[in-house]
Amino acid sequence: MSQSQSHGSGSPLKYVIVFRPGENKGEQEDSVVSEQLLLHHAFEDTELITLSAKLGKIGIIQALWTLSEDTNDTCKIIETEQETMITIKVEGEFYITLAIGVDPDLLAIPNPIFEGHLWNCYHFFTIKYGDFTSFEKHVLTDLLNEHFVSFWNDLYRKPESLTRNFLQYLCHDFYKVADLDPNGDKQWEATIIQDLLVQTENYLGIKDILVYNIPSTESTYVGKCKYGLIRNFCNEFEDLGHFSNWLQHIHTVFGKISSHVLAENVHYELHSGQLEQTNSDGIRDGNDLNLSDNNNETDSNTFSQLSTNFMHNLTLPITFAYDAIQEVGNTTGINNSVSLFMNYLPKWQNNSTASENEKNKTKARYGYLISPLAFDSLPKSYKLKKMHLKFNGEERKPYHVLFWYYNDVLVVIICNESFDSIWSKEYLNELNKHLENSIKTLYDQNLYDLPNTDNHSNKKNDILNFAYLITDKKRNKLYSSFPDLSWFNEQQETLYRTTLELVSNGLEQLRPQITANELSITTIDSNKQWGLDIMGNILSMLPSNSPVPVTKDASIPLMKKLNFLDKLNEKVLRDISIETLRAIETLSQSINSNIQEEKLLKTSDGILLYIRNDCNNLTIILKNWIQDTKHQTRALKYKNHTLNSYSTSIEDSNLFKNLGPDVISWYSEYKQILQDDSS
């Protein structure tokens, strides 16, 4: 974790460099140094960057490491008046540098946030392709262009994604875990183990099954603590953290998990003008703001070419199409195009007809997002995802990964490359049945709010007066109820709206002679299964003339667990997050060296901030004592404290007791979650 000044936002990213220094000593020729450069990508083409300038930056970075007192550092920062270069060293010989523009007039983003993204970018590359050292230079350069450019361009064009999970980027080696009731029903786990993992046909084929709760940004907000990994079944999966963070990243950037997003067939593009397609090489072209895929461009009006054109439009990202209805309404003409778009989605499977008592509940949606059931004409990335993962100390090697969902629960099935059963339609249908039985039980027993949700959610006690972030250092798990942070102004938020209009218009121009109503009747009831889908609830997004019934109340009665931070405005939440970050940075040395330390502070907004670091956990608790009337007198008298030696038990700490009986009671129960995960 690095300390330095903060930087202006808006569009803070300038360029990214990847290079591998040679073994030559002393002064080197430019031709030699140029061989070391693997990637240089500038986000703004305002001026041509010469090769000499690129090589000069490499020299500065190398000199910093050479002159450093600690050559084992994995991150260093160079600050100038114009920019700041954040560099990480990976695999002992590769350097990755991100340049950040400096603008004191713009809202500041702390350096550790960018450092966290740098590490994530590298780790996501390794689980997708493998380690840098496993490739020849020309192959590595091609893969770096494919991954790094797309990764950073999406963050550059949607900069609010940089800070959405603000404090979590300080713990980039940790992955978010969903906080479910430790006393909840475990039958769903037994179903997966007994019906899938221990079965003879699966035992040597399925390596692991991962279950995540990923509530849609459009769903009823249930609290951040419910977000993350619920369970996996293989203790030897070494890349579990990187894989989990990759899923959280794409969900943060694109808003939803869909077939297109998982197949990485969608990226932001910044243009102005008519919507244009990409060429067959996947080189982005044109002058508009759109989301595009890598299918071939066609200009002909023949039937076969129209089919190709249709496939191009079909694989445009469905991820963003649904927000448009609420954003622009009927006046933009987007409803017809979204209706047309919905007609080309496959029919989803529903549970059996709900009873009279369940009519107000949304029917469950479930099915495959990535599987060999996808339409034959779709690219292979829609049929399976090949990822290079590590298990049980073995070398990183490729695995086939399938994705299945049930409402907001995502299930990931990791299979050996030699497991041919996944190409059988009968096997996939049987797998679908077992997963449905298991995850339905998980929903009914652990995620649904069984009491009357509307009345229950209005109780004052449902809004906790504290929020927490706890890391498990031994298992790299992170538990947090800190809400997402919106860092930027409304100008960036309009990016979604512009993109949605263009995507829908592209679909509307496909076959304008056929009305949306005609297609909704003929295609929704058809038996064609394209194999494309999207997580979350989309029933309410169907047109009113759709034959699929739509309930007025489409919200899922999920269990809520909110805290006072969820109710704060963005500015106050941002200020509290920055003060928390600064307090954590002062502990950076002790966090790395496991020196025990404990602090109790008061933020400028009057919030109590408790931080405790020991060899097992980093614990951060924010307490809103102002609304805690039973505890006001004691809290008002407290002063900032720092202790370097204290009782082994956090519950015996006098500083911890200042947080009040509600926090003490919560932690005594919360210990069971930590203990269950460590068992």
UniProtKB/Swiss-Prot annotation:
Residues spanning the membrane = none
Task: Offer one example of a GO biological process linked to this entry.
Answer: late endosome to vacuole transport via multivesicular body sorting pathway
What subcellular compartments does it reside in?
Endosome, Multivesicular body membrane; Prevacuolar compartment membrane; Vacuole membrane; Vesicle
- Name the Pfam families for this protein: Intu_longin_1 (PF19031)
Q: Choose one Gene Ontology CC annotation of this protein and give it.
A: multivesicular body membrane
- Signal peptide stretch: none
Q: Which UniProt keywords apply?
A: Autophagy, Endosome, Membrane, Protein transport, Transport, Vacuole
Highest taxon of source:
Eukaryota
Query: Which cystines does this chain contain?
Result: none
Membrane topology classification: Peripheral membrane protein
UniProt keyword Protein transport present: yes
Q: Which terms in the Gene Ontology molecular function aspect does this entry carry?
A: guanyl-nucleotide exchange factor activity; phosphatidylinositol-3-phosphate binding; phosphatidylinositol-5-phosphate binding; phosphatidylserine binding
Family in the record: Belongs to the CCZ1 family.
- What is the documented function of this protein? In complex with MON1, is required for multiple vacuole delivery pathways including the cytoplasm to vacuole transport (Cvt), autophagy, pexophagy and endocytosis. The MON1-CCZ1 complex acts at the fusion of vesicles with the vacuole, through its regulation of the SNARE complex during the coordinated priming and docking stages of fusion, and particularly at the stage of tethering/docking.
Name of the protein in question: Vacuolar fusion protein CCZ1
Organism whose genome encodes this protein: Candida glabrata (strain ATCC 2001 / BCRC 20586 / JCM 3761 / NBRC 0622 / NRRL Y-65 / CBS 138)
Q: What is the lineage of its organism?
A: Eukaryota, Fungi, Dikarya, Ascomycota, Saccharomycotina
The gene name reads: CCZ1
